[in-house]
């Protein structure tokens, strides 16, 4: 266990070996915050208990990376308003797929880096169909997010059939980098991106949507594409 009862600020924090964190006054982390990364190598870690101990966090200066295998709720991050680097969700194979939504990120307005989902690459038959995100249906919880530095979804395995829409991103106006979705899995449910109707700009050189076999309507991207100057590509979609 790690007790930091009076600490209000940290340079950076990489948590791989603690089961419980108590930091009730910690509001600011100027560098990276990694939670549960490489948890498979540290069997005793409880990523949810670590999140519970960070309930006062409002600011992460660089990357925030969360291994979601043991996460059941993001509610402890309800005060987080700014991430300066990437916000990375490492999605692993899991039979404990109790995570239902992104509730807890309602205060987050800006991600300076990319918003990233990723499963990594697996050998055939080596990973469970169920993942820590198998019950996620949309982006509900990110309802006040207005600006991100980039967007990347890279899915190589797992059941994401319940994830059907981008609902929750209605206030997203600006993506300062690339927008890429690359799906190499048949259990992918995304069919509705109407929440991106208000997206005004994508400033990166790549705008790509691949593997969304249920997605047929791209008109919600009309406003963003009007001003887009890079390469827009879609293939293996609906």
Give the ranges of each region predicted by the language model:
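Concave beta-strand-loop units of leucine-rich repeat
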Residues: 1-25, 30-53, 59-137, 141-216, ...
